[in-house]
UniProtKB/Swiss-Prot annotation:
It comes from Desulfosudis oleivorans (strain DSM 6200 / JCM 39069 / Hxd3) (Desulfococcus oleovorans). Pathway: Carbohydrate biosynthesis; gluconeogenesis; Carbohydrate degradation; glycolysis; D-glyceraldehyde 3-phosphate and glycerone phosphate from D-glucose: step 2/4. Its EC number is 5.3.1.9. The active site is at 358 (proton donor), 389, 504. Its main location: cytoplasm. NCBIfam families: PRK00179.1. This is Glucose-6-phosphate isomerase.
Length: 546
């Protein structure tokens, strides 16, 4: 899709001028938030959620201009086209149909002669049957003992989303299954897991589309060797989530990597968008039970429908995306924090960090032309109130950055009602959640400079009724849709990630040097650049001239 250069748009120039106006003293948030109708005008309620942006540095004109920008860039049409199977991943000539994973309708979608609707139903059925058989003790390890540990072996999008959801819904977990994540190729990660599991009752879930990802295969091979050392047949303890026809998509002892069962993932679902596919479906169904996983999917689908069909002014992820553009390109904040006041959401920020930064960390348009403006910002976060004792000093009195606060009305554990200072723990949490956005927005003047707060620091608050599987699904899909909408405004492709390729290529060259040294102790690193050679010699020795 050809689009005009952003900075040439009259709307873009109007937004630039309006951002200067919003910097005037009379538009400080301490004044804007005093308006009686501020919350009603600058918040959206839908799907048992509230998206409150009343403490963003916007007025009605700013929102109207941003909505015009969304219309000009045809982002809603592009989002709808994405959900029906259009080729929106233009650099790889692929659809991006992560939303199909959680769509239980019979609407037919065909991509590259694949009936996507039928394939999604097939994969969900296979996941249900497998997870229920494991829970019933019908599928066991080599010694006949039921599985009690599940280890997800994957990296990046192959585990981060699953880890977020598993942590968020741990209160709903099957208490007979412990879930572990082996992502880092660092042997310390493997060693810690090896000490925590019972090999006889461990099921390894290898997640790799190609079954060639260096870190994942190094860990998978390490796990297979470990199981053999315990006298166990890896083929009875390994399942794969991979693409059709990959080396991991085969069972039996003659397979390149024998597995008990394989589940399919598809090239029209990117890793960072894949938690609702078999990538998350297999481990989460084992950990939570399939029915809870399906409820999670249906929550995500509700948000997908909202994101695709709600009018722009009442569309939560679209509004969040436009505010992201505003804060980044017009107010020039280089980062955003995600602060959930709910410890089960501790892994949300790392997931969104990868989702957003890998999707939108681009410098060229989908057509390969210079973008001309900054795209993605740095995403980081920590649960509240922990974050208040970590980086909130900087948030209040140092370099400002926008924050998404997330609050939950009903905690997963509501039986604990002891009072301290007259309130429960959950109420104490909320006292802080209510106060922090206000303090950031309003600030406080003081003759003592050390006690002066400039305020005017923007934030949004996302309110969830509970942390049920459906609510977590909605939250996941909210951030996915927000990420995609921002990309569509910029005209970039949020579904490729060529930025990771150069480092991988150089790592392959270094790996070859290491392998040569392992084969021949006399091998020298004379063909390697001097800086890399220093580290290789520190790690493996110099060779002939030692």
């Amino acid at each position: 899709m050809r689009t005009s250069r952003l900075t040439d748009l009259d709307l873009w120039k109007q937004l630039k001028a309006h951002a200067e106006k919003m910097a005037l003293p009379e538009n400080h948030l301490k004044h804007l938030t005093m308006a009686p109708e501020r919350l009603a005008e600058f918040s959206i309620q839908a799907l048992d959620m509230v998206y409150d942006f009343s403490r963003q540095r916007v007025d009605r004109q700013a929102i109207d201009l941003l909505m015009e920008l969304a219309w000009e860039r045809k982002v809603t049409q592009r989002f709808q086209a994405m959900t029906t199977g259009a080729v929106v991943n233009t650099t790889e000539n692929r659809a991006a149909l992560h939303t199909a994973c959680r769509d239980f309708s019979k609407a037919k979608r065909v991509v590259n002669k694949i009936d996507v609707t039928a394939e999604m139903a097939r994969v969900r059925k296979e996941i249900r049957e497998f997870s229920e058989a494991v829970h019933a003790g019908q599928i066991t390890g080599a010694t006949g003992k039921p599985f009690a540990h599940v280890v997800v072996v994957g990296i990046g999008g192959s585990y981060l989303g699953t880890e977020f959801v598993a942590r968020a819904l741990a209160a709903y977990a099957d208490k007979g299954i412990c879930l572990h994540f082996l992502a880092n190729v660092d042997i310390h990660n493997f060693g810690e897991i090896a000490e925590a599991i019972d090999p006889e009752t461990t099921l390894w879930v290898i997640v790799s589309k190609s079954f060639t990802t260096a870190e994942t295969m190094a860990n998978a091979n390490q796990a297979a060797a470990f199981m053999k050392e315990q006298g166990l047949d890896p083929a009875r303890h390994f399942v794969s989530v991979t693409s059709k026809g990959s080396p991991g998509d085969q069972t039996g002892q003659d397979a390149p990597f024998p597995v008990l069962r394989s589940f399919h993932m598809f090239d029209f679902i990117g890793g960072r968008y894949s938690v609702t596919s078999a990538v998350g479906g297999v481990p989460l169904s084992l950990y939570l039970g399939y029915d809870r996983f399906e409820t999670f999917l249906k929550g995500a689908h509700q948000m997908d429908v909202h994101a695709a069909t709600a009018p722009p002014t009442t569309n939560m992820p679209l509004t969040a995306a436009l505010l992201g553009i505003w804060n980044n390109n017009f107010l020039e904040y280089p980062a955003q924090a995600i602060i959930p006041y709910a410890s089960p959401l501790a892994r949300l920020a790392p997931h969104v960090q990868q989702l957003y930064m890998e999707s939108n960390g681009k410098s060229v348009t989908a057509e390969g032309k210079p973008l001309g403006v900054r795209s993605g910002v740095i995403i980081f976060g920590e649960p509240g109130t922990n974050a208040q004792h970590s980086f909130f000093q900087l948030a209040h009195q140092g370099a400002p950055f926008p924050i998404d606060f997330i609050g939950v009305i009903k905690p997963q554990y509501d039986a604990f009602q002891a009072l301290s200072r007259g309130v429960t723990n959950h109420q104490e949490l909320w006292a802080n959640l209510i106060s922090q956005p206000r303090a950031l927005a309003e600030g406080k003047e003081s003759e003592d400079g050390h006690r002066s707060f400039s305020g005017n620091r923007p934030s949004s608050t996302i309110l969830l009724e509970d942390l049920s599987p459906a609510s977590v699904g909605k939250l996941l899909a909210f951030y996915e849709a927000r990420t995609v909408y921002e990309a569509f405004v910029w005209g970039i492709n949020p579904f490729d990630q060529y930025g990771v390729e150069l480092g991988k290529k150089l790592a392959s060259e270094i790996r070859s040097q290491m392998a040569a040294k392992n084969r021949d102790a006399g091998h020298t690193f004379e063909n390697v650049d001097s800086i890399s050679r220093f580290y290789l010699e520190k790690l493996m020795g110099k060779g002939n001239d030692e």
